[in-house]
Amino acid sequence: MKTSDFDYNLPQEYIAQKPVEPRDSSRLLVLNRQSGELTNRIFGEITDYFKPGDVLVMNDSRVLPARIKGIKQDTSAKIEILLLKRDGEGCWEALLKPGKRTKPGTIIDIHQKGGVVSIQAEVLADKEDGIKLLRFSDETHLMKLGEVPLPPYIHTPVADPERYQTVYALTNGSVAAPTAGLHFTPELLKRLTEMGVICTYVTLHIGLDTFRPVKEEDPKDHKIHREYGILSKETASAICCAKETGKRVFCVGTSATRLVEQASHLSQTSLITSYSGWADLFILPGYKFRVADCFITNFHLPRSTPLMLTSAFAGWPFLRKAYEKAISEHYRFYSFGDAMLIL
């Protein structure tokens, strides 16, 4: 297995620059692993594939207003901060743009819209992959000073920032949306609940690894970034109950899938128990899924870790066939793009 195996060519015009309205009007490509069939549907029709007692697991992490504009105190040059995650000791890991010449000790003034300096950020240290360690003078209003960051391949501003949040987003912490969940509407979730589907939530705060291509020739040499996750006792209980009664677990997105699989591997008393902590499970082809029976996801970037996880679930030959069909039939790709359901 080589990283180049997970490459494919995508015309730029297939990268969705804005979301469709309503959310559940996006297209849905259904992959049936048992029959080998590929079926075109609309996302709002996904209810056809659920049965009473099935469990739907969604990631309720909310995207932080993590893109913050500032001015370097020593040169008065403009600089942009992209918050990644807290380090657990009162500081933040972040990317700076431009960042190469921004050394430890640099002070960044962060202004409110009125032009008054609100807080300052100090660069404390350089870390791997261009990441900087920052400490803010005051975090009380930090989240009010930033904007929700969009993926680097989206060049069109979004009229409503809430369109880059799921309708059930609850807990601030991600720098990228759990995009498979963007297709759900409150009405669709209500229909599923009325059908007897158990809707449950986990929290996994998504980092930049979701966008970064794997650079190592052998993907097994890639070190996936850690992300913080929480899986409640109630969600674990719902999953165990479904498995014990022959029902299925549908995971929405690679983030929810990674967290439930990691929690299952760490559980010593049953299939899965509650969990809170860092998630760093790197799922590659050959992995045996313990929790996820069905999988809802978007179309992913070449050589990316989400694509590798999806390949592990569907099988890369079948998934490649699905991607070829999606490209030939003009599906929309990436964060604001269409979805697939893998049965």
UniProtKB/Swiss-Prot annotation:
Main EC class the enzyme belongs to: transferase
Reactions this protein catalyses: 7-aminomethyl-7-carbaguanosine(34) in tRNA + S-adenosyl-L-methionine = epoxyqueuosine(34) in tRNA + adenine + L-methionine + 2 H(+)
EC number: 2.4.99.17
Annotated GO CC locations: cytoplasm
Pfam families in alphabetical order: Queuosine_synth
SUPFAM superfamilies (UniProt xref): QueA-like
S-S bonds: none
The entry's keywords: Cytoplasm, Queuosine biosynthesis, S-adenosyl-L-methionine, Transferase
InterPro entries: QueA (IPR003699), QueA_dom1 (IPR042118), QueA_dom2 (IPR042119), QueA_sf (IPR036100)
Compartment(s) of residence: Cytoplasm
GO molecular function annotations of the record: S-adenosylmethionine:tRNA ribosyltransferase-isomerase activity
Pathway(s): tRNA modification; tRNA-queuosine biosynthesis
Keyword Coiled coil applies: no
Principal location: cytoplasm
GO BP annotations, alphabetical order: queuosine biosynthetic process; tRNA wobble guanine modification
Family: Belongs to the QueA family.
Function: Transfers and isomerizes the ribose moiety from AdoMet to the 7-aminomethyl group of 7-deazaguanine (preQ1-tRNA) to give epoxyqueuosine (oQ-tRNA).
Subunit structure comment from the entry: Monomer.
Protein name listed in UniProt: S-adenosylmethionine:tRNA ribosyltransferase-isomerase
